[in-house]
C-alpha cells in the first residue's frame, strides 16, 4: 500500500524542453563502448514525477555541469526509444547536452527540504511495486519505506572490469585534453570490488535485497 495519498499518474510528454529535475539517484559509472563510461541519473521532474536520465558521461562533464545529488538541474529531455519504462528519458543532444546546475537542497532540520519532495508518495509494499512494474503502468521508480532494515549485505566481486569492456574502451580511441592541452586516452573509473545491498522487510513480510546505487 502507499503511505500518504498517491498522486494521479501524469502522462509524461515525449519531449521536455528545459526539464527541471531534482536529482536523487546517481549510479556508479559503467563502461560504454561508445562513450568510455556512463552514469544513470534519476530524480523528480519539477519535484513531482519520477524520471530516469541516461546516458550521461558524468566524470567527463565540465566542472560547472557536474551535479551533486539533491541538486536541481535543467536540461532538454526526449523520451528514450530504447527503454520501454515510462520514466526513461535521454538528453536531447546526447553527451553534448548542456546541463545547468542550480541550488542543492540542504540537509538541515533533519533533511526537511529533501523530504518535502521524496516523501510525497511513499510505498510500503514491495509486492505492490512489483505488481505496478508488471502492470500497464510499468512503474520502475518509487520511494519505498520498509517495515524493517534487516541487514546491510556486502559481497566481494571481481576487482577488474570485464576484459570485453576494457577492450571496447581501448578500441574506442576515446580521448580527452589534459591541463596542458595535450590529448590523452581517457582512463576508465576504478571498479568497486564490492556489491552493497540492503535486506529489507516490507509490508506483507516480503524480504527483498535491493542493490544500493553507489
PLM features per residue range, with description:
Residues 81-91:
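Short, Lys/Arg- and Gly-enriched loop/turn segments at beta-strand edges
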Residues 1-4, 16, 101-214:
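Nucleic-acid-binding small beta-barrel platforms of the OB/S1 family
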Residues 76-83, 97, 204:
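Short loop/turn segments at secondary-structure transitions that flank enzyme active sites
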Residues 93-100:
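Short edge-strand/loop segments of extracellular domains
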Residues 3-81:
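N-terminal ordered "arm"
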